[in-house]
Amino acid sequence: MENLAGRKIPAGRWEFIGFNLVTDFPFRLKDRARLDSGEFTIPEQFGGGILSLTGGWEEIPDWAAYARALPTIEEELAALPAPVDPGRAVYVIHGPPAGLGLDVARGGRPVGSPATTRFVESARPLLTLHGHIHESPEESGVWMSRLGRTVCIQPGQSAAGLTVVVGDLEKMTFDRRVLPVD
């Protein structure tokens, strides 16, 4: 098992490239939160920001100033290692792209990353895998979409059981399954 965050790991004929940062959200824990781009508007927050440390928590007195000093999602994505062959690349990007129905929060509100959308359009990988907005497939009815030639998957999480996507990269066929949990 390897930590894929910010790395490129070959697996047979494929290259997996990981990205674990997400566009800022209104919740307190900010370990992996970033502004999407320079134009990003910070959402109304539920309490002050905190970072988790080995020995406890660190309060962030001014989250907006702190966040503006960090690289944006757009900048961090641009710094990822490039694949040898985009047609054999699988990006595992925690936050979903905007505009594909893979980013729909409770109440039907889209919260995806425009920077991720632009990155996928530019990088043109074979496949992207996403998470973060667990309820999205249940809210939007969409768990798989396309952005140009790229297949984008967000399996989500179902109250009915464990949600998995089984796929064949050679054939580019995928099946979403909800497995009952006893």
For each feature predicted by the language model, list its residue ranges.
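Active-site neighborhood of phospho(di)ester-bond hydrolases with catalytic His/Asp-centered motifs
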Residues: 2-6, 90-94, 120-136, 153-157
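Metal-dependent catalytic neighborhoods of phosphoester/phosphodiester hydrolases
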Residues: 1, 27-28, 102-104, 137-147
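Charged helix-capping and loop-helix junction motifs
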Residues: 106-115
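Active-site-proximal loop/helix segment associated with metal-binding centers of metalloenzymes
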Residues: 17-106
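Metallo-beta-lactamase
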Residues: 1-12, 16
